[in-house]
Amino acid sequence: MLDSFKEDPNLRKLLFSGHFGLEKENIRVTSDGKLALTPHPAIFGPKEDNPYIKTDFSESQIEMITPVTDSIDSVYEWLENLHNIVSLRSENELLWPSSNPPILPAEEDIPIAEYKTPDSPDRKYREHLAKGYGKKIQLLSGIHYNFSFPEALIDGLYANISLPEESKQDFKNRLYLKVAKYFMKNRWLLIYLTGASPVYLADFSKTKHEESLPDGSSALRDGISLRNSNAGYKNKEALFVDYNSFDAYISSISNYIEAGKIESMREFYNPIRLKNAHTDQTVESLAEHGVEYLEIRSIDLNPLEPNGISKDELDFIHLFLIKGLLSEDRELCANNQQLADENENNIALNGLAQPSIKNCDNEDIPLADAGLLELDKMSDFIKSLRPEDTKLRAIIEKQKERLLHPEKTIAAQVKQQVTKEGYVDFHLNQAKTYMEETEALAYKLIGAEDMELSTQIIWKDAIARGIKVDVLDRAENFLRFQKGDHIEYVKQASKTSKDNYVSVLMMENKVVTKLVLAEHDIRVPFGDSFSDQALALEAFSLFEDKQIVVKPKSTNYGWGISIFKNKFTLEDYQEALNIAFSYDSSVIIEEFIPGDEFRFLVINDKVEAVLKRVPANVTGDGIHTVRELVEEKNTDPLRGTDHLKPLEKIRTGPEETLMLSMQNLSWDSIPKAEEIIYLRENSNVSTGGDSIDYTEEMDDYFKEIAIRATQVLDAKICGVDIIVPRETIDRDKHAIIELNFNPAMHMHCFPYQGEQKKIGDKILDFLFD
């Protein structure tokens, strides 16, 4: 088979690609390391309906399922995002990072996963498992690695090496069966290199291979993986299926089911399973539709990795499967399967002691020799078929280091840390560290960092609910959401099918907005609009003794706005006009309304959030210049540009320079200690301002005004900017200065100060409920 790839560059490229999917289980725990007895978080919806976030055996055992992707990078991004979403939505709980369980309650108190109805097949199956195996053993968690070769690769091989009169599906079945045989024979190597469950609580399991650790927990003396040993998650007795042909494979599993050894194919706990994408996952379905992918089930959670597995591990498993494809197709009889099982158990229990491996002739081979033989073969086909790939070569070298130096294995490192810190403390410390890392980047959707932050937020919230998301236009932040037959198109997170087109046009035009609101007795600032800059300049005398705002007619985000609260010169006025006309062909000059500016976010006639916006500012220290203080404040990791982070960096443009000049300051001025210097008059977060949540504190009087304004313009998702007087007695002196048809949600979700609001959830509720 190797010759087929050497001769065909297209096949060579396809060989190192594939389709990848991951399933990861984690137990939810309390802050002191006990099994969380709370229900599955309601935000994820019914387990039957969410394709991404379900439960495994227990209500406390969450399962994350990525969609099928075309690369390891993309499937890892999905896993990372799902892990982050679940972590952030599991309130006051942590995700236990080990395959072996945390502190467990009594057997009868371990909750089995709940479903829509008590007689759900999923519930009944779990009750069967609890009765047959016990509940505690079901809490062993891990990662399932789903893989299929590209269809074009199978087509190419079928054309070159299929048997006479062999159908493509029969060829495909034979191909995957061959890889499965290689995996079954050599899985001991994968367990040695990826095993990560050598430590456990003393009351969870007992084996003659264990020793006690200082904290009273237990560890396999020289072991790698309790989960993959005979003390782990196995069928009650060894089930040897016939790998000589696909039909024989199907028949042997069917015979075990008929004999009552297992209830269904779901209970066939083989380290690798042949599967197809049909949802019933019965042996009859597999027989009818044939093999579509492989499911590797023996991967432990790696507590040293935030997401339970590294990309290097994923790449190595891929290479392992490629090796299976390129290897000779050898018989895997019951005797050989028994030897393979013994090798697996021996490595799982004694791998760090480097025991010998039994070959098919029952001969002892030193572990390092046997492992290096397989790794060298992988190196050879990488050199032959992908010589330029230094990353894959480095991955193989890393595995060789682990073979030659057992202390470098994942299992040895985990055992060392648990011995030092204690079983519960080590895993809790890891879980807390990973949670802190997740919280620090809670606003981010991995792989979508180039998109607007509000888009990332609503996308994450859609994933949490199991809503399918398609990117229609990345540059335009245009998404399609689908839940069942219900489809919604959303642009920039808040432009939806609920929008009224004329309402958007009215809000886009600030002159029209003010006219319509004023006609409905809603207070707005008085002013004039100008389309000719020369005429606007000539009107200087009308405004020179007033407090005014100069702003573009139709822009958003506070761009191009200048505010004069104190006396200003003709030159200042002209510069403000230059700035405003640079953003639009028309400008508005209106009265300045004293007070504090608040953003009211109204969704479907309800105020969901209120934000006080403080203009861009720095606080002096008596040492640094204004420019240096801005540079320092902009180092905050939550500040970015183009709405990709919760806060915007403070700019040093003409608007800010003008503002400084109005205070008789420059960029080189050194403010006194604790002196606050404002760089903008307008308080938009989009121009570097600070956001403070005021939802609970805001008077209902102003909330009702915000709602009434959106109703006048028939706006369903709207940002209402209101100047609120500081004194209650003056509240009738408020004014609405703007309505926004595309309000940013991120500043409510991640304010500079105050409670974070789940605005993505509110919009999705509006769209789908």
UniProtKB/Swiss-Prot annotation:
Which positions are annotated as binding Mg(2+) 1?
A: D721, E738
Instruction: Give me the reactions it catalyses.
Output: L-cysteine + L-glutamate + ATP = gamma-L-glutamyl-L-cysteine + ADP + phosphate + H(+); gamma-L-glutamyl-L-cysteine + glycine + ATP = glutathione + ADP + phosphate + H(+)
Entry GO MF terms? ATP binding; glutamate-cysteine ligase activity; glutathione synthase activity; metal ion binding
Q: Where does Mn(2+) 2 bind?
A: E738, N740
Protein's UniProt keywords contain Nucleotide-binding: yes
Q: Which pathway is this protein assigned to?
A: Sulfur metabolism; glutathione biosynthesis; glutathione from L-cysteine and L-glutamate: step 1/2; Sulfur metabolism; glutathione biosynthesis; glutathione from L-cysteine and L-glutamate: step 2/2
What Gene Ontology biological process does one annotation of this record name?
glutathione biosynthetic process
Protein name listed in UniProt: Glutathione biosynthesis bifunctional protein GshAB
Which species expresses this protein natively? Listeria monocytogenes serovar 1/2a (strain ATCC BAA-679 / EGD-e)
